């Protein structure tokens, strides 16, 4: 008990890997587990189903994205390029 005060969900690693790494893991997991904006309906209801698979709880849209976030920096650039060509 008491291993998760500083590092949250990364407390499962115990004393291994160092505090900096465990804090980084906890930050990534916190962003991953929050609800994200749906690209189809615009609601903040997108949850991660599996690695890189995201689903909106409101409209049911399922789409591929990043492993930890629904949009990646490379995906944003690609979307911008496609929009400028159209």
Curated annotation (Swiss-Prot):
Biological process terms in GO annotation: translation
InterPro entries linked to this entry: Ribosomal_eL37/eL43 (IPR011331), Ribosomal_eL43 (IPR002674), Ribosomal_protein_eL43 (IPR050522), Ribosomal_zn-bd (IPR011332)
One Pfam assignment: Ribosomal_L37ae
Cofactor: Zn(2+)
Any one GO molecular function term: large ribosomal subunit rRNA binding
Cofactor note: Binds 1 zinc ion per subunit.
Chain intervals annotated as zinc finger (C4-type): 38-59
Keywords noted in UniProt: Metal-binding, Ribonucleoprotein, Ribosomal protein, RNA-binding, Zinc, Zinc-finger
Coiled-coil regions listed in the entry: none
A cellular-component GO term for this protein: ribonucleoprotein complex
Family the UniProt entry places it in: Belongs to the eukaryotic ribosomal protein eL43 family.
Protein name stated in the entry: Large ribosomal subunit protein eL43
Originating organism: Thermococcus gammatolerans (strain DSM 15229 / JCM 11827 / EJ3)
């Amino acid at each position: 008990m008491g291993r998760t005060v500083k590092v949250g969900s990364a407390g499962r690693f115990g004393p291994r890997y160092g505090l900096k790494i465990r804090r980084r893991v906890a930050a990534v997991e916190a962003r991953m587990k929050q609800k994200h904006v749906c690209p189809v309906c615009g609601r903040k209801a997108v949850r991660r189903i599996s690695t890189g698979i995201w689903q909106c709880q409101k409209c049911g849209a399922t789409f591929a994205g990043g492993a930890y976030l629904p949009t990646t920096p490379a995906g944003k650039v690609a979307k911008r390029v496609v929009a400028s060509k159209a």
